[in-house]
Curated annotation (Swiss-Prot):
Protein name: Transmembrane protein 182
Membrane topology, Cytoplasmic segments: 139-153, 225-233
Gene of this entry: TMEM182
Record family assignment: Belongs to the TMEM182 family.
Main location: membrane
Spans within the Extracellular topological domain: 27-117, 175-203
GO CC terms, sorted: plasma membrane
Species lineage: Eukaryota, Metazoa, Chordata, Craniata, Vertebrata
Glycosylation sites: N88, N105
Membrane topology field: Multi-pass membrane protein
Gene3D superfamilies: 1.20.140.150
């Protein structure tokens, strides 16, 4: 009875972990940024403060325009139904936010691409590992194999560790690697009242929750494998 309960909750936590990892991996809301500034001198733009909204993930970086007095800068502005009907997108790997013009030959750009490369590799390894863990657990269930349960549990723990590194690296990226101060100063040459507001998006927030469920599932499956091994003697 206790073994069945452990398998049930292990499977439940594993399913939640896989779902959260895949959603975080596949959606483009790890970073949300709002640029505000009155730069245009056109008469029709007089008295209005324009805003550009950016959201970025593993695959894409997208942006769309809006009006500050019509929309606030909260996270809800980036929800699907609140976005502009048309927006521009580019690959996030070679053009991460903030994208400074004429920087492709600079050392900072090269460092950013290399850092994003490591982050990308860890993200892919985490997704592959958790899919392999799920496959091992599915194979273990019909045969009650303690080896497969232990292997699956180990892979879930490894996936949790990899995604923990992904989260930590992204925090370091936003806080240190992304040259927001230089980007803001460059923009202020054209727009003296320019300001940029950056926050973590809901895709980023799902990743630590997925890490928790993956680690919990991994430990449960290790205990299940040990219990099956002891009962088989």
């Amino acid at each position: 009875m206790k073994l069945s309960v452990g398998i049930f909750f292990g499977g439940l936590f594993a399913a939640l972990g896989v779902l959260l990892f895949l959603v975080a991996f596949g959606t483009d809301y790890w970073l949300l940024a709002t640029e505000i500034g009155r730069c245009s001198k056109a008469p029709e733009d007089a008295g209005t403060e324009k805003a550009t909204f950016h959201h970025e993930g593993f695959f894409w970086r997208c942006w769309f325009s809006g009006n500050v007095r019509e929309h606030n800068t909260s996270m809800w502005k980036f929800w699907y139904t609140n976005q502009s009907p048309s927006k521009n997108c580019t690959h996030a790997y070679l053009s991460p936010f903030p994208h400074i013009r004429d920087e492709h030959n600079s050392t900072s750009y090269d460092s950013a691409v290399i850092y994003r490369g490591f982050w990308t590799v860890l993200m892919l390894l985490g997704v592959i590992t958790i899919v392999m863990a799920s496959f091992l657990i599915i194979c273990a269930a019909p045969f009650a194999s303690h080896i497969l349960y232990k292997a699956g549990g180990g892979f879930y723990i490894l996936a949790g560790v990899l995604f923990s590194l992904v989260v930590v690296m992204y925090v370091i990226w936003v806080q240190a690697m992304a040259d927001l101060e230089n980007y803001t100063n460059m923009k202020k040459m054209d727009c003296p009242d320019f300001a940029v507001y950056v926050r973590y998006g809901w895709s980023f927030m799902l990743a630590p929750i997925g890490v928790f469920f993956a680690l919990l599932a991994g430990m449960l499956f290790l205990l299940v494998g040990r219990a099956i091994y002891l009962n088989s003697d």
